[in-house]
Regions:
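Structural/interface elements that position substrates and couple domains in central-metabolism enzymes
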Residues: 1-118
């Protein structure tokens, strides 16, 4: 591992912790806006094994998708005026989609027609 890898990893580690703390704070605000108990809400979130899994933290997975994750994220954004973190998450995901489309388009264009598959 290079010193640059280690330094970015250390900075990323602290930013990840900050993101988790900020997410919890945002969920507390949303919970209180809707008269929910934030401790119960966080218990529901932590009950899902995927929250503890490292599987979704691998580089190269691309943007999130599926049926429930985008829909439920948008629902929480719409449910509160204080969801700046979740709005940023949605924005990052949209940028990742756009980036993947551009990269995919460029690589397809660079290939000779006879080497491209549909």
């Amino acid at each position: 591992m290079s010193h640059i890898d280690a330094e970015i990893g250390k900075l990323g580690h602290n930013a990840y912790i900050a993101t988790k703390v900020s997410f919890t704070e945002e969920m507390e605000q949303i919970s209180r806006e809707h008269s929910a108990d934030p401790h119960h809400v966080m218990s529901v979130i932590h009950a899902d094994r995927r929250v503890k899994s490292k599987e979704h933290l691998r580089p190269g997975l691309g943007p999130y998708g599926g049926k429930c994750v985008p829909k439920d994220t948008r629902e929480l954004i719409n449910a509160s005026h204080t969801t700046t973190l979740l709005s940023a998450v949605e924005s990052v995901n949209e940028n990742a989609k756009d980036s993947r489309l551009i990269i995919g388009t460029k690589s397809a264009v660079r290939q000779p027609a006879e080497n491209r598959s549909l």
